[in-house]
């Protein structure tokens, strides 16, 4: 998959192991997200990528960040189509009233690259 870095803090997505389903996405810079009522906090992931034709990227919170810290995506799941060439962005929010701080290089989200059916309708 072709990846174009857009931020000096960019780190290429990686799999935690050969059996991991998703590629961990690294935050290019630090920040903090608070509880937002349906607004979310838009944060760029510091890169653009070419997902192969016939596939789609699904961005989801890493399990521990969602379960243990209440981190979620404002739009439930980020969908990156094969023809999208802009910067990958997440709209973050917290389920609870608390906040979550992160540092550059932290892994908050993951992307699953999955095949997509093309059907005549």
Identify what each model region corresponds to.
Residues 1-121:
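DUTPase catalytic domain/fold
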């Amino acid at each position: 998959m072709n990846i174009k870095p857009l931020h000096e803090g960019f780190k290429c997505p990686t799999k935690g192991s050969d059996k991991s389903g998703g590629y961990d996405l690294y935050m290019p810079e630090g920040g903090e997200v608070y509880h937002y009522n349906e607004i979310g906090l838009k944060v760029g992931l510091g890169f653009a990528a070419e997902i192969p034709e016939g596939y789609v990227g699904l961005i989801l919170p890493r399990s521990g960040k969602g379960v243990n810290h209440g981190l979620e995506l404002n739009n439930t799941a980020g969908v990156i189509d094969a023809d999208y060439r802009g910067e990958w962005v997440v709209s973050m929010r917290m389920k609870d009233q608390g906040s979550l701080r992160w540092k550059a290089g932290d892994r908050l989200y993951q992307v699953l690259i999955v095949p997509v059916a093309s059907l005549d309708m």
